Amino acid sequence: MGDFNDTPSDKSIIHGIKTMSYPSDTTSAHSLYNLFSNSEQLAKPGSHKYQGEWAQLDQIIVTGTLLDSRNPMHLIPGSNRLFTPQFLFKTDKTYHGTRPFRTYYGYKYEGGYSDHLPLLVDFSLPLAP
């Protein structure tokens, strides 16, 4: 999980890490699945904005085991999303629209959070006995 500095469709993600698309019709316990591979539908506007362009540079990659609902701990289908509350954004005076409310904008301290938006995913966990 984290900032890969590449989009889900980049060769480094697909061929380098060998990720599969999610959701997938079939899953294998030994394969890796990028929960943000279908970012056009999942992650609007994207997790990072650079020179006016949003891109999904942050990924959560899991094994097929976490996609199997028969396992005690598993991903809740459809729970992968960007966290986009209004307080994480600031007006983008240069490129218009909004941008993440960053801690620093160049050398200027803004007091924000990050230049990337957070990713969220929900897991089902077994109850303790």
Question: Model-found features: residue ranges?
Answer:
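Active-site flanking residues adjacent to catalytic metal/cofactor-binding acidic residues
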Residues: M1-D3
